[in-house]
Amino acid sequence: MKYIDLNADIGESYGNFKVGEDEAILPLVSSINVACGFHAGDFMVMAECCKLAREYGVNLGAHPGYPDLWGFGRRSIPYTKEEITNMLLYQLGALSAFARAEGVKITHVKPHGALYNDAVVKVEVAEAVARAVWVFDAEIAIVTLPYGRLFEIASEMGLTVIREGFADRGYLPDGRLVPRNQEGAKKTGDEAVAQAIALAEGWVKAVDGTVIKAEVDTICVHGDNIEAVKLAQKINRELLNKNIYVQAWRKKRA
């Protein structure tokens, strides 16, 4: 029997600005990554997401980013290692308080946007992210691409690393994601569903047609995608057709 974790980035609304359908996607995934107020999210949204994590029994992850509401955390901003570590500790502490109030715990950390991408290629950023998780709680896992600096450094530190693939993003031949400002960056509809199935089976096709080996533990559906709920429904259905079951990565598997 084969299993795969399906995760969604949620909690990216704040104030009167609404993004995604958080509760609608909860029955369709096994893990969530909650924005922690720097790139998106606020104290009311974070509290609600922790409540939903408890009600639906999904893994609760922190989704910290650069302090960049204007750019939705998708702009690379130069910070020192100490600044990056501390900005993550700040965000982890905030989400942890809401999680504790709901009787749940943070199981993983997945950096957001530019911070995620920077940690893949920049040693200093990867070290800062890994250190933040280590000093906050070394039992918490890090979610990242199945290669790159963060994967290597976190593994060397003895942290649990969850290898991630993306249903709705294009891939470069070297396994990195296609930058959002380039052609082929996004996958939609049946193309995204097909890519999710391929990832669950251990491979993915790059924008140039190259087939890449991609052993992943979890597959992401971006919650800010307007078709996220429909996409997650289709992915669930097609995975079942392949006898692949959606299950949170921390649960014991047969």
Curated annotation (Swiss-Prot):
Reaction catalysis annotation: 5-oxo-L-proline + ATP + 2 H2O = L-glutamate + ADP + phosphate + H(+)
Record flagged with keyword Hydrolase: yes
GO aspect biological process, one term: carbohydrate metabolic process
Transmembrane segments: none
Protein name: 5-oxoprolinase subunit A
Family annotation (CDD domains): LamB_YcsF_like
HAMAP family on file: PxpA
InterPro entries noted in UniProt: Glyco_hydro/deAcase_b/a-brl, LamB/YcsF/PxpA-like
Coiled coil region boundaries: none
Family statement: Belongs to the LamB/PxpA family.
Highest taxon in the source lineage: Bacteria
Origin species: Carboxydothermus hydrogenoformans (strain ATCC BAA-161 / DSM 6008 / Z-2901)
Oligomeric form and interacting partners: Forms a complex composed of PxpA, PxpB and PxpC.
EC number: 3.5.2.9
Role noted for this protein: Catalyzes the cleavage of 5-oxoproline to form L-glutamate coupled to the hydrolysis of ATP to ADP and inorganic phosphate.
GO molecular function list: 5-oxoprolinase (ATP-hydrolyzing) activity; ATP binding
Keywords: ATP-binding, Hydrolase, Nucleotide-binding
Pfam families: LamB_YcsF
